[in-house]
Amino acid sequence: MLDAAELLHFRLPAVTADTLVVCVSQSGRSAETVRVADALAGRHSRPTVVAITNGADNPLAALADIHLDTRAGEEHGPSTMTFAATLVMLEAVATALGASSTDGAEAAALAAERLVTDAEATADSLASWLDDRPVLTLLARGGARAAAEMGALTLKEAARFPAESLQAAQFRHGPLELAGPEMAAIMFSTSAATRTLDVGMAAELQAAGARVLVIGDDDVLGSGGAGFALGRLSDCLSPAVAVIPTQLLAWSLARARGLDPGGYTRATKVTERE
């Protein structure tokens, strides 16, 4: 996975005719993503470009060799619907390329429904868990990093809260000094391969006095403290469910601050310039 602007300005020469480039843009109009597709389309020997967007009438879809429409519908503010819908499309792409089909969409949908059964009460309990702590770090490994990145972005966009997303192993290389009573941490742990490491980090942060929330499959909650059990979900779709508690937290914080969680004051829904 590469940031489109980094690919455009620094790594585009590494893309060859044998490369499959999957461009993701909610609007299909994001400046740097469209410029990547345009630059590749102008090559004599061009790679195959797949575009994933919400809707078909956009420049990115027009430039792509293959276009996948998430059909998420009209969306205002943070990309909550399109984030989940994009993960469904990415799993479809992976399956088409030969990955094992998990047929996990129904399980993910049911898990998401459970999390929002009493959305307002859950949102308020998450705000109480944070309890005015000024430091909130979202930690994850592997595919769960998508949930951590999106969660931190939503907290910034919707609640103007300066949450930070970090790869869990990188967190030990210095940022661990943040651990203490003023810190809150959300650990996303959806992979059995790193569960022991995730649980150990969560316990270490708790021992340092931090408030810790663990989001993962049923086994990970044995680490103690607060948490959300998601059940067994596919690796690709689990971030769409795991991110929901952070969305609810952002909504509660925005409401408490008198903000519109679906509105912007400086950013825009569609970013058409770098």
Language-model features: where?
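Residue-level detector of functional hotspots within protein domains
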Residues: 1, 7, 52-53, 122, ...
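Glycine-rich phosphate-binding loops that contact phosphosugars or nucleotide phosphates
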Residues: 1-109, 181-184, 188-236, 240, ...
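Active-site phosphate/pyrophosphate-binding segments
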Residues: 66-184, 194, 257-274
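Composition- and surface-driven signal marking solvent-exposed, interaction-prone regions
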Residues: 151, 199-201, 242, 265
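Peripheral docking tails and interdomain loops at the edges
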Residues: 229-274
